[in-house]
Amino acid sequence: MELFFRKIGNGAPLIVLHGLYGASDNWITIAKHLAEDYTVYLLDQRNHGRSPFAGSHTYDDLLTDLADFFTQQKIDKATLLGHSMGGKIAMWFAAHFPEKTEKLIVADIAPKDYLPEKNDSSFNLHQNILLAMQEIDFLLVNSRNDVDNFLEEKIDDVRIRRFLLTNIVKDRLTKQYKWRINAAVLYDYLDEIVSGVNKNRLKQKAPITGYPVTFIRGTKSNYILPEDKILIKEIYPDAKIIDIPDAGHWLHAEQPEKFIKAVLE
C-alpha cells in the first residue's frame, strides 16, 4: 500500500503518525516548526485521509504499511513521533526495526492493553462515533453544518464534532460530501485498535534500550495514568517522560508550543 504523505523541511527524517480520526492535515502547524530541524513526513494512515481504504486495520497491517513507506522513500533511519493510535504503531515498528529507529516519541498513549477498559465511557464513545458516522445519508447533506446537526444528536462534545468535521470532503465527480475515514472497517476493528500494542506483546523484546525514548503526557488526559509510568519504565528503562500541564489527549493541539519543546528535548 502506498500511503499519502506530506514532506516538509530539510534534515534528518522524522515521521509523524496521527491517531484515530486524524490525518496529516492536523499536524501541518507542528510540522512547520519541527521542519527547522528535520525533514518531516506527515502520513495519512490506511483508512484515513487521502490514503487508500482497506478491509482490515490491525497493528500488523499498519506496521507493514510503515515498513513499506521506509522502503518506498528510501529512508534508512528515522525519528518516529506517534500520537495515540499512531504512538502504538510507532512502538510496534520500533520494536521490530530498532535499526531503523533513530528515536521514539510517543504522545499520550501507554504500552498497555486498553481493552479491559472497553466498558468505560471512552470505548463507548468511539463506538458511538463510528456508528454515527455510518448512519449519515450524504444524499441528504448539503453542507458540513447538516452533518454537525446530525452528529449533535449522538455526540455532545462540540470539540469532537469539530474534529470529525475536518474529515468531510466533497467528491470531485459526484460533488457529494463524504467521509475520508473508513468508519465501517474502523468499527469492525475497534477492539484491535483499542487493545493495540501492550506490555505482553512488547515484553518479548523488552527491556528496550536500543534507541532514545520519550513519552509526552497531557496531565488532563487519562490515557497515561501515574501508574503507567512504572509500566513504561519496565519496558523502556531509559525513557524520558514529560508532562504537559493543562493539556488533554490532543495535547499537540491544546499546547502546541510546549509540545514542540518536548519533542525537541
For the regions a language model picked out, list residue spans one by one.
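Conserved HGGG/HGGXW glycine-rich cap/lid loop of the alpha/beta-hydrolase fold
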Residues: 4-53
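Conserved serine/cysteine hydrolase catalytic core
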Residues: 171-235, 240-243
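Catalytic histidine-centered segment of alpha/beta-hydrolase-like enzymes
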Residues: 244-260
